[in-house]
Amino acid sequence: MPFRLRRDTRKWFQDISKDFELDFDMYYLCLVAGLAAGGRRSEVKASDTTELVDTFPGSYREKGRTIIALFLATEIERVGISKDDREAVHKQIRDLVDPRTPSQLSEIGMRQMNQVSYGGFDALTEEFDDRPRSLESFLVNFQKIIT
């Protein structure tokens, strides 16, 4: 199962997308916003998304495990599992991770990570008055949103 990007994400980032090396950059920014919002999720129909890749691309490849760890920590907290409950933590990890897949995420894990990215996009569009016009101003405001 691939990483998926909401179709409206491309339009919203259109003025700064030239500054991105990969389309995955947009996905990652939305994911971080969703994680910062406590794992905020949105359900989006597959027809309203585009397929990106099924593995962490480019420079994200070496950071994939860290990204997954942030996702797992957020999910464990979101569902209210105590970090001291090793059995419940391990079950959550088993449900979301599959080391045999290119992304290292299970189908459920990928679906949930995509939903967090969609929710992060919602959070960004709510926080910004208008779509970003320059990368510099976007990053200043983005940093305020995620901290």
Language model regions located:
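N-terminal leader/targeting peptides and immediately adjacent processing regions
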Residues: 1-32
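Short, basic amphipathic alpha-helical segments that act as recognition/interaction helices
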Residues: 21-49
